[in-house]
């Protein structure tokens, strides 16, 4: 199934003996999530259909958030990743949006979980697509970038999946040190606008 077909903009073509990063996520879905039937087949390049119950499953990008937080000195809050993917590289605070959450609520929750800082204001900046290898599964994301203001930046502490968090002058930031593709590109855009 789905062999040699190029799926979803920007994805690699599919061939036998591929790495997980090269597989379309729908290839990993073998059973209908509604009735459990193994007759869960390709419907088109974006979906699978159950031949028993007619359920159609469309694979869509997961929503994720990223925070640009500046302190009073104009320094950017930067984190160091504690876990893979890209463990040890620089990152910005953020993460997956929960069901029922707005992007603004999601970025505020993630900032609190990762840094202990309370977001009091958010302003949407832009979005970028990304892929994120998690537990052997390639997750396609749509990352929503926000400029955030926090209540008290003196309460900063690294928590959750952040090994370290610190303030960096914009002039010292090297986008190539950021491990995730979308965050690297987002930092480049942010620096171009704010330098």
Walk through the language-model features, giving the residues of each:
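Conserved Nudix-box catalytic region and its N-terminal flanking loop in Nudix hydrolases
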Residues: 71-113
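Short cysteine-rich clusters marking metal-coordination/redox-active sites
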Residues: 32-35, 50-53
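A short coil-to-beta-strand element that immediately follows conserved catalytic motifs
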Residues: 42, 118-127
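NUDIX/MutT-family hydrolases
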Residues: 157-187
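Residues immediately within or flanking Cys/His clusters that coordinate Zn2+
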Residues: 29, 47
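Conserved N-terminal beta-strand and adjoining loop/helix that marks the start
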Residues: 52-76, 96
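Active-site-adjacent beta-strand/loop module that shapes the phosphate/pyrophosphate-binding cleft
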Residues: 126-154
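Short Cys/His-rich "knuckle" micro-motifs
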Residues: 41-46, 60-63
């Amino acid at each position: 199934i789905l062999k040699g077909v190029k799926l979803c903009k920007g994805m690699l073509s599919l061939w036998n003996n591929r790495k997980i990063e090269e597989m379309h996520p729908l290839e990993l879905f073998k059973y209908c999530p509604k009735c459990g039937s193994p007759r869960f087949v390709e419907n088109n390049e974006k979906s699978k259909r159950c031949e028993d119950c007619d359920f159609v499953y469309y694979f869509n990008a997961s929503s994720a958030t990223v925070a640009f937080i500046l302190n009073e000195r104009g320094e950017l809050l930067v984190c160091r990743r504690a876990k893979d993917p890209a463990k040890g590289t620089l990152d910005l605070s953020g993460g997956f949006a929960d069901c029922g959450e707005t992007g603004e609520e999601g970025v505020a929750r993630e900032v609190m979980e990762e840094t202990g800082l309370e977001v009091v204001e958010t302003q949407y900046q832009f979005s970028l697509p990304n892929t994120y290898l998690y537990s052997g599964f390639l997750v396609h994301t749509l990352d929503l970038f926000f400029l955030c203001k926090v209540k008290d930046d003196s309460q900063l502490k690294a928590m959750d999946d952040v090994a370290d968090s610190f303030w960096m002058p914009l002039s010292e930031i090297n986008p190539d040190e950021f491990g995730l593709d979308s965050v690297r590109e987002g930092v480049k855009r942010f620096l171009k606008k704010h330098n």
